[in-house]
Amino acid sequence: MDIRQVRETIEMIEEQHFDIRTITMGISLLDCIDPNIDRAAEKIYKKITEKASQLVAVGDDIAAELGIPIVNKRVSVTPIALIGAATDATDYLPLAKALDKAAHEIGVDFIGGFSALVQKGYQKGDEILINSIPKALAETQKVCASVNIGSTKSGINMTAVADMGRIIKETAEQSDLGAAKLVVFANAVEDNPFMAGAFHGVGEADVVINVGVSGPGVVKRALEKVKGESFDILAETVKKTAFKITRIGQLVGQMASERLGVKFGIVDLSLAPTPAVGDSVARVLEEMGLEMVGTHGTTAALALLNDAVKKGGVMACNQVGGLSGAFIPVSEDEGMIAAVQNGSLNLEKLEAMTAICSVGLDMIAIPEDTPYQTIAAMIADEAAIGVINQKTTAVRIIPKGKVGDMIEFGGLLGAAPVMAVNGHSSADFIARGGQIPAPIHSFKN
C-alpha cells in the first residue's frame, strides 16, 4: 500500500464519515427450545451471554487497532416464534425480556430476532409472537422485532398484513420508540446484520459474524471529483469506491471471526446513512446532478448508485449478503429530511425508489390518526414491489403526531418530519384477508 492510499483511507475516516456500521453476531437458539417458557428464557440468556461475551471487547480492540470506528455491536437470533412454539405460553414477553437482559449483560446496542416468518400462513407460535410485539417493545430497550409477510415463492399473506397494520398502531401507542424497532418484510434475508430487521436464519451456522459497512460520505466525495462527467465515469467511480469500503469491511469481519472463534458470514454492501451532515445517501444522489432528492431522475440516480455499489462490493469480498444496496431511511438521513421538509419528496416517490434500493419505506413518520387499514395497505404495496421484483422490501413506519410535526428519535435513528398519507380508504381491500398468490415468474423449477 503506497502513501497515497494510506492518506486516502485516513481522509475517508476523518473527513468523510466512513465507519463500520455494525458487527453483528448471529446465534442459533434452536438448542434452547424447551416446553417450559421460563426454562427456555434461561437457556436463551445463557447461550447469548456465553457466545457473545467478548463481542463488544473484540470490536473495540479492532477499531482501536485499525483506527476505524465500529459504531454498533449487535446480536441476531433465531426467530423467537420458532422457539416459543414449543411452549404452552400465550405471551412471549418472558423471551423478549431474556433477550433484553442478555443484550444489557454483554453490552451490545441492539438484539434482533423477536421475529416470525408467516409468508404463507400462521403456525402455532407466530400469532402469539405477533400479538406480543407491542408490549415486548414497550417493556424492553434493546430488542428489535420483524415479521416476514410475503415472498416471491409464496405470495403475500394478506391476513398477516392486516394484523401488522394493527400491531404497528398499537406499538406506536404503547411506546415512543417501539415502532422504530419493528420491521415488516417481504423476502426477508437470513444473514442481515442491520437492525431492526436482523434475525438468524435456520439455514445458518450455529454462530456467525456478519458485517455492515457505511460510506455515503466517501462516495459523495469521490463523485465531487467527476463533476459533469458521463454516467459511465460516474458508475465506475462509485464501483471503485465501493470496492475500497467493502475491502475494509471484509478485513474487520475476518479479524472479528478469528478472534471470537466463530464462522465469518458476509459483508452487507449497503450504504447506510446517519443523521450527521456529510453522511447522507440523498446528498450522493444530488451530487449526480439533482437539485433535490425527489425530483424527476431520482429513481434513475438511485438505480445507478445501487448497481455500482453491488458491482464494486462483489469484487472486494467473496461472501456478500444481507440487504446489500443503498438505504433510504428518512429519519436517518439529513438530505432526505430536508427533501421532505421542502416538499420535494413524498411517500409516492419514496415508494418508487423502493423498487430500486435495498429496503423500503424506512423510518417514515405518518400521522397518528392514520387508520390501521391504511398502514396495512402501505405494507401490501411494498410487499408487492418486493414479491414481483424478487427483492427484499420492508416497511418501518411510525404513526406519531400530525403532518408537519418533527418526531425526534435521537442517536442513529435521527428525527422524521410527519408525512401526509393518501386520505382515501383501503379498508374494504384489507378486510378481504387470505393470500395473494405467488407471481407466475416465481416458478423456476
UniProtKB/Swiss-Prot annotation:
Gene3D superfamilies with a match to the protein in the record: 3.20.70.20
Disulphide connectivity of cysteines: none
CDD domains: RNR_PFL_like_DUF711 (cd08025)
Family annotation (Pfam families): DUF711
NCBIfam families recorded: PRK05313.1
PANTHER family found in the cross-reference section: UPF0210 PROTEIN MJ1665, UPF0210 PROTEIN SPR0218
Protein family: Belongs to the UPF0210 family.
Protein name according to UniProt: UPF0210 protein SUB1511
Organism: Streptococcus uberis (strain ATCC BAA-854 / 0140J)
